[in-house]
């Protein structure tokens, strides 16, 4: 089996991704790294991820990061197993996908929007200049590993920002 490892460049820079890569190596799990993840993931991030996943020959996804990495992984996993939704814009709202996403293991590094356990994810439509809220019970990660050590490894400023993000989401509802 091969992992498709979705994370962002900051987690690579902070050395957090290296810890997961070390676990892959210790367990002889081949992986493909995908780090084209923006702070607010875009349609292009998902589309590029779908192409990279298909080219990699991976069997499952490991998403390390905050909501952005996990949301990107959710979008990739849904589109790969539901090719009728290759136009990522078609995922906006309540998507009528037929198949569960690629099995995904979510490793959150922030305590923000709980992307690792919800049916929601957000993708930015840069052309329309708007957030697409996507709702799909088929996109929930198969496994969520909430390790406080991952959260402690984040800069305090980022931890505070994700707390404010969670508060903002709660107020918006």
Whereabouts are the PLM-identified features?
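A glycine/threonine-rich phosphate-anchoring loop and its flanking beta-alpha core
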Residues: 82-173
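Short, small-residue-rich loop/turn micro-motifs
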Residues: 9, 28, 38, 148, ...
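N-terminal small/polar loop signature for handling phosphorylated ligands or for N-terminal nucleophile
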Residues: 12, 16-84
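Short strand->helix junction
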Residues: 10, 38-39, 112, 153
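Short beta-strand/turn micro-motifs composed of small residues
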Residues: 6-7, 65
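Cofactor-binding loop segments of dinucleotide-utilizing enzymes, especially the Rossmann-like FAD-
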Residues: 7-8, 36, 107-109
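N-terminal, positively charged, Ser/Thr/Ala/Gly-biased leader segments
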Residues: 1-4
């Amino acid at each position: 089996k091969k992992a498709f490892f979705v994370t962002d460049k900051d987690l690579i820079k902070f050395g957090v991704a290296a810890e997961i890569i070390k676990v892959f190596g210790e367990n002889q799990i081949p992986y493909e790294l995908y780090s084209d993840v923006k702070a607010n993931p875009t349609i292009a991030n998902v589309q590029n991820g779908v192409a990279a996943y298909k080219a990699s020959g991976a069997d499952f996804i490991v998403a390390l990061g905050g909501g952005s990495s996990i949301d990107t992984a959710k979008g990739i996993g849904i589109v790969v197993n539901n090719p009728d939704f290759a136009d990522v814009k078609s995922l906006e709202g309540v998507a009528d996908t037929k198949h569960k996403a690629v099995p995904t293991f979510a490793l959150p590094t922030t305590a923000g929007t709980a992307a690792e356990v919800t049916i929601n994810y957000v993708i930015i439509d840069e052309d329309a200049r708007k957030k697409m809220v996507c709702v799909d019970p088929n996109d929930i990660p198969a496994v969520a590993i909430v390790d406080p050590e991952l959260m402690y490894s984040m800069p305090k400023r980022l931890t505070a920002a994700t707390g404010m993000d969670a508060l903002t989401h709660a107020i918006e509802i």
